[in-house]
């Protein structure tokens, strides 16, 4: 488990449960991702699944740390102006600055659909530009 700050009591309790703990640098109130990924590589962990909210997804994209994207679609529509989005962060100002994906696969799981992509570097012009 990676953390930036915790009480000695909490650290001791987690260690007693057998949890491996890594104190990492703080970046904008969260664990700094690049040092964490370096630590994982040193532990011979070469692949992770970052299943989370829009902010972690945005951070991985903005820091060019994501190589693949797996997008699950369910036949349901959620909405509302305050609804969460799959990618948070500041976004990009122009379509040409968007993070590019290359489709690599598609699978159905009952009614749900999994789309698989490679994350490409940089942006290119699109029809709206």
Model-derived regions: residue spans:
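Enzymes that bind and transform nitrogen-containing heteroaromatic metabolites
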Residues: 1-129
